[in-house]
Amino acid sequence: MSYIEELGEKAKIASKKLLTLDTKTKNRALLAIADELINKKDEIKAANKIDLENGKASGLSFALLDRLELTDSRIEGMAQSLREIAAFVDPIGEILTGWNHKNGMSIAKKRVPLGVIGMIYESRPNVTIDSAGLSIKSSNAVILRGSSNAINSNIYLNKLFNKVGEKAGLPKNSVQLIEKTDRKLVKEMITLDKFIDVLIPRGGKGLKKFIIENATIPVIETGAGVCHVFVDESADIEMALPIIENAKTQRPSTCNSIETVLVHRKIAEKILPELTEMLLKDKVELRYSEEAYKIVKNTDFGHKENLKLATEEDFGAEYLDMIMSLKLVDNVEEAIEYINEHGTHHSDSIMTKNIDNAEKFLNEVDSAAVYLNVSTRFSDGGEFGFGGEIGISTQKLHARGPMGLRELTTTKYVIRGNGQIRE
């Protein structure tokens, strides 16, 4: 039996034990792990520092280094996420609906775990804790395959989770990390349908494409984040500017940050000078369509070397960095058509006072989350009140949008009777 098969077999055994684990034990374990994350903050940062130094030496981009870094506040956020997950109602065992058959038997639809989750993700070590916490609360076993860039951070976090969790009553091997960084193991993992029930990839287009094309296990696709803001003709500019700034610059390496702004032509000359100045001050590289570029090219801005003409490749690109494209459109219909063609069905926002345009945008943009006068940065399990998320699904089957506890469950029918047979 191979290394991956051994992990799979252990996970399957653990998943059966998790079926009978009571809510009190799960919550006790999650709270104890949260406390230990705070207690071991320095040790976590020491392991993370090794990954950061290795990343810098190998030439990782600013965006990837940002995703990799664990600061005090991010560790505290991981602990808080576990506390929130512990506070949620346990979804397992919930009766969604029920009725009595005319022959006297009862039929109930009950929420149950998925079983064994295979989680494949890149760079962000906080995903290790979020994924483990959500899996445990939903009574799923999980096999984690993080990025080689974060291997030291992930190993430390996984050992901490298991040491404290098992002491609090979690079944052994409920959470396992693939500690070997050989990429060939991913191919083996995604074909381990004997033991793994579902795969959830979080990462770039290349990773997801490889998994979707090669997996023999059902995949819940968490999409790339080519997110947009459309500034309509009636937009409140004073409101729109800080929303765009937040959506682009607060944490550009995340999938819910925007990559492209669409501006209504009739408002372009009014908003572009101020928008351009603001984002150049923030050191964002701006890639404007030719028409937009002409409006501001003769204006005196600081950091003007970062104002550039866009190419066709910029529209639809996921930068995950301090880079943003911008183009002009004639109306809300054109904005919707553009977003549906160039976006990734993740999160998109409209800035407008026009109720009809707002409703049209919210109804017709084919994305997991659509916003009116709000930053796309709120597409997040924590912000939606889920405690954390195991990913943001951009597909339509099983789950869509931030995936919390309920999205890690399925259902079964429980029928009770006293000797009924079908005639």
Where are these regions (language model features)?
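C-terminal core of ALDH-fold dehydrogenases
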Residues: R28, V332, E337-R422
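Flexible, glycine/charged-enriched surface loops at secondary-structure junctions
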Residues: T23-K24, I92, A168-V175, Q250-S257, ...
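ALDH superfamily catalytic-core signature
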Residues: S2, K10, S123, D130-S138, ...
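N-terminal Rossmann-like NAD(P)+-binding subdomain of aldehyde/semialdehyde dehydrogenases
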Residues: M1-I107
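Rossmann-like NAD(P) dinucleotide-binding subdomain of oxidoreductase/dehydrogenase enzymes
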Residues: A87, L96-E238
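Short, well-ordered beta-strand elements within core beta-sheets of diverse protein domains
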Residues: A14-T20, L262-V263, D321-D330, H345-I350
